[in-house]
């Protein structure tokens, strides 16, 4: 009886803490907090403060610096440089597979885009149309297709790589909120990924269109791409770029870096119908490493 009461009490306390956490997410000035975090993360002086921030982060989150190209944390010019650190050569060999994991992290969800909806968590869904900023034509390209949502934890390698070779056809920056992205918010915030600020990147590949959606979150100091650098559009206004009309194309090979998160978040992959089959070992919570096999062409 005591154990039952303890379980009920623990579950009740957890529920209260989760409710308070979500309430905090709604009342805190999300963008101001993220800008302040970005300011601190870019500080180069005083060096003792920069080094202390990095050292405490490594200790708290258990970052494996043996994989880094530069393992001495004091040699990073600022926290952002440390957070987006490169890996040593050979740390992430590319698998001989059709489709590679684009990032270190964990599978949040993956599966079919059924009736235009992507599964979020515990009975919560969001539409591909909403995720892509209301673009009906783009969303139709992925109707009945497959999606994979990968969450990058603070300790992870935070550069994103191409799961397949592709030519960039367009991008769309979509302004939004900056809820934290984790299990608690996924289970309690409706349409989380379709509400947060995000950058949608569209590619033409050998099997058809593919979308990579880089989702921002609270205290994420920024998103960068290899073709345009930091994404810094006017606030509260969507910005679309058609790369097919530009004089020089952006073509990336499978495994090439395509972008990075300043303090991390989530990447969502969208594939068309009857094109992709994910490896059976992947499911919600499965850890991923950039470059390992994610799936194959159907």
Language-model features and meaning:
Residues 5-298:
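Contiguous, well-folded functional domains in the mature portion of proteins
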């Amino acid at each position: 009886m005591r154990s039952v009461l303890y379980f009920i009490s623990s579950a009740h306390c957890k529920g209260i803490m989760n409710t308070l956490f979500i309430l905090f997410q709604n009342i805190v000035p999300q963008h101001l907090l993220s800008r302040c975090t970005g300011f601190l993360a870019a500080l180069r002086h005083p060096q003792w403060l920069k080094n202390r921030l990095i050292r405490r982060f490594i200790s708290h989150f258990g970052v494996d610096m043996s994989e880094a190209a530069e393992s001495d944390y004091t040699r990073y010019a600022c926290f952002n440089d440390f957070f987006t650190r490169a890996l040593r050569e050979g740390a992430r060999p590319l698998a001989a597979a059709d489709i590679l994991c684009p990032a270190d992290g964990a599978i949040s969800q993956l599966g079919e885009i059924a009736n235009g909806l992507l599964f979020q968590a515990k009975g919560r869904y969001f539409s591909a149309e909403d995720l892509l900023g209301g673009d009906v034509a783009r969303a139709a390209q992925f109707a009945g297709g497959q999606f994979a949502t990968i969450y990058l934890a603070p300790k992870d390698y935070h550069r994103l790589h191409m799961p397949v070779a592709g030519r960039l056809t367009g991008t769309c920056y979509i302004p939004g909120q900056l809820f934290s992205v984790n299990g608690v918010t996924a289970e309690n915030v409706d349409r989380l990924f379709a509400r947060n600020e995000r950058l949608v990147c569209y590619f033409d590949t050998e099997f058809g269109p593919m979308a990579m959606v880089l989702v921002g979150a609270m205290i994420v100091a920024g998103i960068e791409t290899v073709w345009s650098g930091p994404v810094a559009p006017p606030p509260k206004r969507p910005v679309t770029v058609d790369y097919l009309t530009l004089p020089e194309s952006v073509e990336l090979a499978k495994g090439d870096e395509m972008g990075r998160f300043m303090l991390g978040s989530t990447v969502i992959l969208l594939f068309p119908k009857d094109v992709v089959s994910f490896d059976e070992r992947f499911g919600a919570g499965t850890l991923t490493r950039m470059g390992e096999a994610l799936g194959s062409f159907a």
